[in-house]
Amino acid sequence: MSSNLTALPAGEACALETLIAPTPGGIASRILAKKGGGSVTLFAFDAGQGLTEHTSPFDALVVVLAGTLGVTIAGARVEAAPGTIVRLPAGVPHAVEARQPARMLLVMLRDAGAA
């Protein structure tokens, strides 16, 4: 994995809503940081959009910034509102659906020794 911590200006306070433009009827994403230990990606979803069910070999955290997300983990659904965080366990099927226009941070937690 390449070393990338330059997606954000150094030493500046950035408003998250200015870092990504929503896509009408779609999903927009922007990698904010990426290193061997993981990555941080900002997502903007239009209403009804989401990430279909999949698995990941690593744990991840969903941090809801705006809107409401339906998060399904191993068939169990939870509603996540702004200011909440949801852990997605490694190897467990999960999906995300925006009930309304929404933004989230996805923090991938890779093994520090992973390449």
Which residue ranges define each predicted feature?
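A short, N-terminal "cap"/entry segment at the start of jelly-roll beta-barrel domains
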Residues: 1-37
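Ligand-binding loop in jelly-roll beta-barrel domains
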Residues: 90-114
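Conserved short histidine dyad/triad with adjacent acidic residue
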Residues: 25-26, 36-56
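Structural motif
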Residues: 39, 68-70, 77, 93, ...
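A cytosolic small-molecule/anion-sensing beta-strand core signal
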Residues: 65-66, 81-82, 100
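Short beta-strand His + acidic residue motifs that chelate non-heme Fe in jelly-roll/DSBH
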Residues: 51-53, 71-72, 88, 93-99
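Short, conserved beta-strand element in jelly-roll/cupin
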Residues: 44-46, 56-71
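Short acidic-glycine-tyrosine-enriched beta hairpin
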Residues: 75-90
